[in-house]
């Protein structure tokens, strides 16, 4: 998106198709608060930047690029495994955008694949029964963009409730500025932050 007005139009288009603010935030790689802010047209009144949009379409349009990113993610996982002396049984992809990366990491590391779908309205999400189970597994959680960390926190909580242990979160881009969530280390390929402003 080239401008905030275009971002607003896209958010409004998705809202008119019946998507929730949470679903729109996932689609546009924005925080829920930013989507709410956009849809309220507050951006017309305010001059300050409220969020940073992370667009990774150039990576996602070709499987070869997803594999390249997955190789970097796999390398980070191996580095953390060696540094912190832990093993990994499974790779978990958070729907929708974490799944392609998790699938490739699972393949590259020869680990089971778990698919998790957060529910847009409830606190608990669910694990797809078409993929590996969680119980008794040491799990790396993979997603594309972490804005507030809420989805990752919910995933960690649900993994724990199902008898698994989240040992690491690896994300493409982080807006959070934290190194761990709920005691689980977080590593990202890119970190963003706003410097200065009002």
Swiss-Prot record:
InterPro entries: GfcR-like (IPR022854), PRibTrfase_dom (IPR000836), PRTase-like (IPR029057). Pfam families: Pribosyltran. Gene3D superfamilies: 3.40.50.2020. One of its GO terms (biological process) is regulation of gene expression. Keywords: DNA-binding, Transcription, Transcription regulation. GO terms for molecular function: DNA binding; orotate phosphoribosyltransferase activity. Belongs to the purine/pyrimidine phosphoribosyltransferase family. GfcR subfamily. Contains an N-terminal DNA-binding winged helix-turn-helix domain and a C-terminal regulatory domain (or effector binding domain) resembling phosphoribosyltransferase (PRT) domain. This is Transcriptional regulator GfcR. The gene is gfcR.
């Amino acid at each position: 998106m080239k401008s905030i007005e275009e971002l607003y139009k896209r958010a409004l288009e998705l809202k008119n198709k019946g998507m929730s603010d949470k679903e729109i935030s996932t689609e546009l790689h924005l925080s829920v608060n930013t989507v709410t802010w956009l849809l309220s047209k507050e951006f017309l009144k305010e001059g300050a930047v409220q969020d940073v949009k992370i667009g990774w379409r150039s990576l996602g349009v070709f499987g070869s690029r997803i594999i390249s990113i997955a190789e970097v993610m796999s390398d980070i996982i191996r580095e953390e495994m060696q540094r912190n002396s832990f093993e990994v049984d499974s790779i978990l992809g958070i729907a929708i955008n974490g799944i392609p990366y998790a699938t490739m990491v699972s393949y590259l590391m020869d680990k089971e694949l778990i698919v998790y779908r957060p529910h847009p309205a409830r606190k608990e999400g669910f694990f797809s029964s078409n993929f590996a189970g969680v119980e008794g597994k040491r799990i790396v959680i993979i997603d594309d963009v972490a804005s507030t960390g809420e989805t990752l926190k919910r995933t960690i909580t649900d993994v724990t409730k199902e008898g698994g242990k989240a040992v690491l979160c690896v994300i493409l881009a982080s807006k959070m500025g934290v190194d761990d969530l709920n005691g689980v280390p977080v590593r990202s390929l890119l970190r963003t932050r706003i410097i200065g402003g009002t």
